[in-house]
Amino acid sequence: VKELGIEHPTLVGHSFGGRVSILYASRNDVRSIILTDAAGVKPRRSFGYYRKVYSFKLMKHLLPILIGKRKAQMLIEQRRAKAGSSDYNRATPMMRAILSKCVNEDLCHVMPKISAPTLLFWGDKDTATPLSDAKKMERLIPDAGLVVAEGAGHFAMLEQKDRWIATVKAFLKIE
């Protein structure tokens, strides 16, 4: 941003891009922020989630010993394809490690440092970044306001495009 000579940018972030926007805005001066179904709140995990994760890790270590490396790799990839998101499945092993670390990093501690006006536009049916995350962000970011897109999921800005555009224009005071 500095290399481009941009001062006080308006940031727009969806999902992982929201995470990037939150971090940037907590460390830099920005004019405003628009977060749509943004990541940044560490998800609450059920016992079943941890059981799945640790059984997969155990499988990765034991299967090669029990059935051989080639067969084990095939079974591990089949299981990963069923359990992982499409982004995760397409990623290289290095990117998978980075994605896992990022998804599990909670940014709530930096949110109070954001001084810019912040619009939160969220689908109430979002399962990737649930509405409860938006409500938490609204509490933690000092000048944040939440608009809920009823019936929309993780891509609320596409599912309710006209409403999103109107909301953003009003927020930015664009006619």
Map each language-model feature to its residues:
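Conserved alpha/beta-hydrolase catalytic His-Asp/Glu region
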Residues: 35, 43-46, 61-116
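Conserved acidic catalytic loop of the alpha/beta-hydrolase fold
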Residues: 1-9
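Conserved alpha/beta-hydrolase "nucleophile elbow" surrounding the catalytic nucleophile
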Residues: 9, 13-18
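Catalytic histidine-centered segment of alpha/beta-hydrolase-like enzymes
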Residues: 152-165
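Catalytic histidine neighborhood in serine/cysteine hydrolases
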Residues: 138-155
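Short beta-strand/loop motif that positions the catalytic acidic residue
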Residues: 114, 120-122, 126
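Flexible "cap/lid" loop of the alpha/beta hydrolase fold
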Residues: 19-65
